[in-house]
């Protein structure tokens, strides 16, 4: 979720957060629920299970996320973040604009979880990839010659993780979408 959350906090409120400068490749693991705000840089929030990675989403400047003990936040480029344990947020929630941004994040996380569950339960591999690309196109809003196009700043392996498929299944489905002229 992109937000202007750092702009709504005064210096006293911002001082309640841990400010961290993290190098590319660093990882954040949380023993309890932690709220992380990116001031600069980028990262990805992932689950790992049986040696497989499932990327929940990519994060960048002005994104807020929640990290818990079942996921990891990997830093993809040098980043400046602010983090705080969820248990220490009581005073911050008195700031109405901060509380709204935080609530919006919780709502978006809930909606994302439902979309993931729905796609895992009900959609074919082609449907998962097509729906992911449609959602990404809507978010990026890139147009050329009257057509939407999508910038994929990641590999097919990462795409397969986003849609909950093995790389080979994602590759096959992606090629079928091209063959069926659904994507070009």
Go through each PLM region and give its residues.
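Cyclic nucleotide-binding regulatory module and flanking cytosolic helices
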Residues: 1-23, 60-65
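Cyclic nucleotide-binding regulatory domains
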Residues: 21-78
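A residue-level structural signature of the nucleotidyltransferase/glycosyltransferase Rossmann-like core
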Residues: 35, 80-82, 151
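Cyclic-nucleotide recognition modules
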Residues: 53-111, 115
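Basic, amphipathic alpha-helical hairpins
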Residues: 92-96, 136-143
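Short alpha-helical segments that sit at the start of domains
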Residues: 116-141
